[in-house]
Structures are given as C-alpha cells and as structure tokens.
Amino acid sequence: MSFTFGCPAAELVARFRAAGSLVWVTVISPAEAAAAASAGADFLCVQGPEAGAHRGTFTNEDRPAEEPGLIPLIGEARRVTDLPLVAAGGISDRSAVAAALAAGASAVQCGTAFLRCPESGAHPAHKAALADPRFSQTAVTRAFSGRPARGLVNRFMRDHPAAPAAYPEINNATRPLRSAAAAAGDVERMSLWAGRAYRAAAARQAAEVVTALCGT
C-alpha cells in the first residue's frame, strides 16, 4: 500500500501488514520520515523539492522558500531511520541516480523523465510543452488543486499566485476548467506538472530511458 499526503495510524499500518501488504509512505522531511517509521512503514519515498507534481507533505502548510535538495534530504532521513529509502525528485540521468544511491537511497523513483515517452499517458500538449522554449521554468503552485505542486509556469499559475491552501475545494473548483483546457489543448490553462529537470525528458521509448538511467 502506498500513501502520500499523510501517513496512516500505526494501528492501520499493522492491519495492512498483517494482511500481507507492504506499506510505503512518501515523506518530504526528516520529521515526516521519523513519523512514518514510527508508524511501522516498510519503506519510504523521500521526495525532494525538485520533484514534479504534488508535494507529498503530510500537511498543507506553507513550506520554506528554500528547502534542502534531494541529496541532503536523503542524508537527513537516513539519520532518523534505517528503513529502505526510495529517492524521488530531479532524477534525470545516470549521475543523479548514482548520487542518490551514494547518499543512502536503496532505489530511485522517476516521473518527469518518462513524461515524453510514447508509453506515457500525459496529454500530447503537455509532452510538447516540456520541450517548448516558451516554458522556461517550473514553480510550486496551489492554483490548480489547493495543495503545493510543481509544474511548468503558465498563464494560469501567473494569474493566481495566491491560491489558498484549500484542498480538495480548489481541486474540485478547477476541474471543469482543467478538463476544458485539456480538450482544447490549451497549455496556458492546463496543469503541466514537471520536475526541475524537465528539459532532460526525451521523446524516446521508456526502455531507453531506463537504460540511460541505469547506465547499461
């Protein structure tokens, strides 16, 4: 069982494990790592701020403008738990994989690296935007869902910089707009989730991406 946006209570984790399930919890800080370990999680996804899409934070509170990157975060998590750690956020090439493993991760998790693959279910306009020079940066926003998420900066994000921390209310309110934007291929109003290393995403087979990441 995989959890994000929070960690289930220890009693519930114990029930999952008794039923034969392993429990995976996404964490973004040493405090969350310690809490998930204490609850009985089997392994942790340590998500750095470089990651695309929603931050896996347990709360919806504001985060510091500058947070430690993935590599120092792995080290901080390792100091509070000996559970296996899966590193996520900005993993785009063989050197990033090697750095995460050297820092103490047991494995890595990639998302943005596969967005432009033909096997990806991302909208064609989203795939194209990742290589479009008009989109030159990513930022964290609550504009689309009410929870912090990293994506390509487009008009909708620029027009709504102060969206409230109201999830799922904002998510429900923007759903019709996002659906209409996707139907029209309107990249200025779509949620173009992407990590900081989005320019490294290539339009090639997923197997080729895996080979490049593994260095084999």
Language model regions located:
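Conserved active-site-proximal phosphate/metal-binding subdomains
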Residues: 51-86, 92-216
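Active-site entrance/lid segments in N-terminal catalytic domains of soluble metabolic enzymes
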Residues: 1-80, 213
